[in-house]
Amino acid sequence: MQFIDRCQIKLIAGNGGDGIIAWRREAHYDKGGPAGGSGGKGGNIILVADHNQSTLLSLKYSKIIRASNGDNGKPDLSSGQNGMDKYVKVPIGTTVYDEQTNEVIVDLIRDKQEYIICHGGKGGRGNAAFKSSTLRAPNLYELGDEGEEKTVRLELKYLANVGIVGYPNAGKSTLISKLSNAKPKIANYQFTTLVPILGIVENNDKRLVFADIPGLIENASEGYGLGHDFLRHVERCEVLIHLISMNPLDHDDVIDAYEKIMTELRKYSQLLVNKKMLVVANKMDVEGASENFNKLRSYLAKKGIDISSISAINGDVNNLVDRVFDLYQKTLSTTTETNPFSIPMVAEKVYYYDGEKTIDDDPLDVIKDGENRWIVSSKKLTYWFKKIPQTTLDNITRLGQKIKSLGVEDQLKKMGAKPNDVIVICDYEYLIDE
C-alpha cells in the first residue's frame, strides 16, 4: 500500500432543509391553522480516529467530502428528515490544520476518538413554528442555514515513544528488526527505507513503540532527500536514538556526520534536539570501526555527551534496550504524564453552530454610492437575507424588523442619510422612511 501521511481536503457539511407554509385542511379542524413543518438539520462531517487506518491514502484523492442536506418541512406539521452525518476515518495520530490560518483544529490520538469538524446547517422553521397567542395564522417561514465549510490539511504523526534517526544506511532498519517484530526491507544501499517503520519492543513486561525514520541527508530540513517528509513523525517521540555507522566506507568524517544530522534536526525544530537522546555507534564489527568510535567518543566527551556501541547485525542490542527503557522512564518522571504513551494532546476547540450565534458582532460596513444611495453590508445582514425569503408580507415585515434591530437606519442617519435615500443590502434596494 502506498504510504501517504499528508493531504488536503475540502469539507462541506449539509445544508439545513427549508421550512414551508401550509394549512390544515381536515374536516374536524374547522378553523384550520398553520401546518407547515420545519426543515431537517444538515448532516455533520465527523472525523474518527481508527486503528485500522495506517495511511491517508483513502483521502488523498478525495478533493471534496460532503454530508447530505436536511429535507424540507412537510405540510402535515412534520419536520423534514435530518441529513446523514458523514464519518471520515483517519489514522490514529492525525493532526488537523485549518488550511487558511494554519492553526491546529484537533489532534486525534485515541482510537475511536471523534470530532465534528463541520457542523450541518440548522433547518429553517415552517409557519407552524411561528404560531402564538397573538399570531394565529403566520405567513412566516425560513430557509435552512448553510452547512459549515472548511479546507483542512491532515498530517499523520506516528505515535511512537522512541525514534531512530540517522544517515541512510546507518543500520536503522537492521536495528529495529533486531529489537522488535518489525520486518523492514534491508539492503546495503541508501534509502532502503522509504516509509517510517514501527516496531514494538518489550523489556521486563514493559513495552515501547520504536519508529525507524527514513534516512536524513544534509539539507533534509529544507526538503532534500526523504527525511524532511518524515521528521514530523519524531515530534511525538519522548526519546531519540541517533544512530551512526562506524564503517569508514559510510562517512568521510564521522564527527562531521554526527554534526550534520544534529543540524538538520535543529533546523527542522529546536524541540527535536531538546528531546532525550542516545548517541549510538553501529557496525562495530567492521574493520576500522574502533578508530572511528574512539574519535567520536573523544569529541562528544568534550560536550558531556555519552556514546554507546553496538553491532546491530550481530544482535548485540540488549544493553541498548535497557538504556532506552531507563531513559524513557526518567523522561516520564519529569512530566505529569504517567501512561506509556506520553503524547501531548492539543485541546479540542468547541464550535457552537447555531446560525446567527456563530457570527461575530461585526460593525456595519457603509459605503456612500452617489448623492442619495448607500450600500450597507455585514455578516448578520447577509445571514438574515439568506434566512428570510421575501416572498410573503409577513416575511418582509420580519426582515425589516431585523434590519432595524441591527441599527442600519440609525447608522445611516448619523452619516447624513435623508428620507427617501436608497439603501442597498445584498442587492436589494429600499427607501429610508420619512
Swiss-Prot record:
Domain OCT: 356-434
Gene3D superfamilies: GTP-binding protein OBG, C-terminal domain, GTP1/OBG domain, P-loop containing nucleotide triphosphate hydrolases
Domain of life: Bacteria
Cofactor(s) needed: Mg(2+)
Enzyme Commission numbers on file: 3.6.5.-
GO MF: GTP binding; GTPase activity; magnesium ion binding
Keywords: Cytoplasm, GTP-binding, Hydrolase, Magnesium, Metal-binding, Nucleotide-binding
Residues holding Mg(2+): 173, 193
InterPro entries: G_OBG, GTP-bd, GTP-bd_Obg/CgtA, GTP-bd_prot_GTP1/OBG_C_sf, GTP1-OBG_CS, GTP1_OBG_dom, GTP1_OBG_dom_sf, OBG_GTPase
GO cellular component: cytoplasm
Pfam family, one: MMR_HSR1
Residue intervals of the Obg domain: 1-159
Keyword Cytoplasm: yes
Subcellular location: Cytoplasm
GO biological process: ribosome biogenesis
Chief subcellular location: cytoplasm
Start and end residues of each OBG-type G domain: 160-329
Residues annotated for GTP binding in this entry: 166-173, 191-195, 212-215, 282-285, 310-312
Assigned protein family: Belongs to the TRAFAC class OBG-HflX-like GTPase superfamily. OBG GTPase family.
Subunit comment: Monomer.
PANTHER family: DEVELOPMENTALLY REGULATED GTP-BINDING PROTEIN-RELATED (PTHR11702), MITOCHONDRIAL RIBOSOME-ASSOCIATED GTPASE 2 (PTHR11702:SF31)
Function: An essential GTPase which binds GTP, GDP and possibly (p)ppGpp with moderate affinity, with high nucleotide exchange rates and a fairly low GTP hydrolysis rate. Plays a role in control of the cell cycle, stress response, ribosome biogenesis and in those bacteria that undergo differentiation, in morphogenesis control.
Name assigned to this protein: GTPase Obg
Annotated source species: Mycoplasmoides gallisepticum (strain R(low / passage 15 / clone 2)) (Mycoplasma gallisepticum)
